[in-house]
Design a protein with these regions (language model features):
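Surface-exposed binding patches on compact interaction domains or structured appendages
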Residues: 1-10, 23, 27, 33-92, ...
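A short beta-strand micro-motif common to beta-rich folds, especially ectodomain repeats
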Residues: 28, 103-114
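Short beta-strand segments of immunoglobulin-like
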Residues: 12-17
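Short solvent-exposed strand-capping/beta-turn motif centered on an Asx-Ser/Thr pair
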Residues: 19-21, 31-37, 99, 114-116, ...
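C-terminal edge beta-strand
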Residues: 119-128
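Low-complexity, Pro/Ser/Thr- and charge-rich linker/hinge segments at domain boundaries
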Residues: 127-166
Length: 179
């Protein structure tokens, strides 16, 4: 692992910057230093802005390594384990509403395992006044497109706006006014 990770004494704190409307993604690292770490589980608290009382609800967070929605729309849990001596990045995401007040939101993420003690990380997320376009998808470094892994778009027969459905009359198919 990088020396910086060892030299830094703060292994229990995460600080991030985000914009309103952003699908905010961050990573936590699990290092299996002495033995395998089996069946990781990630729990979230709400993040609370102490100045306004507003919250980013715990239910809005997901850890892509341990849970998701499959191609049929079925919610699943996934076993995520780390071999001895290895590091596993845990990818976490949450949708920040556009109407969220700017300020600092604080809460916790707790990572537990079947065979190791739990570790709680204090999370502090500073939300700016800026409202980001397209949830941040135009800036690939934000990794906001990870939310697409759990997308339920396309599970029904409805056409997604701004597209219009094909029209069939007898043996003729029409699309956007053309036959």
């Amino acid at each position: 692992i990088p020396y910086k990770w060892i030299a830094d004494n703060r292994h229990d704190f995460f600080y991030g910057q985000a914009d309103k409307g952003e699908y905010y993604v961050f990573q936590l690292g699990v290092w299996a230093a002495r033995s395998n770490v089996e069946n990781l589980h990630v729990d979230f608290s709400a993040l609370t802005n102490k100045a306004t009382g507003e919250q980013i609800p715990a239910s809005s967070f997901t850890c892509f390594n341990t849970e998701g929605t499959d191609v049929t729309g079925t919610v699943f849990e996934k076993n995520c384990s780390v071999d001895k001596g290895k590091v596993q990045a845990l990818w976490v995401g949450t949708q920040l509403p556009e109407h969220l007040s700017a300020g600092t939101y604080q809460g916790t993420v707790t990572v537990s395992a079947a065979n190791a003690e739990s570790k709680t990380v204090q999370v502090s997320l500073n939300v700016s006044e800026n409202v980001i376009a397209n949830h941040g998808d135009n800036e690939p470094w934000r990794h906001s497109r990870l939310r697409w892994l759990n997308s339920q778009i396309g599970f029904d027969d409805e056409v997604i706006a701004p597209y219009t459905p094909l029209v069939m009359k007898d043996k003729t198919i029409s699309c956007l006014g053309r036959e």
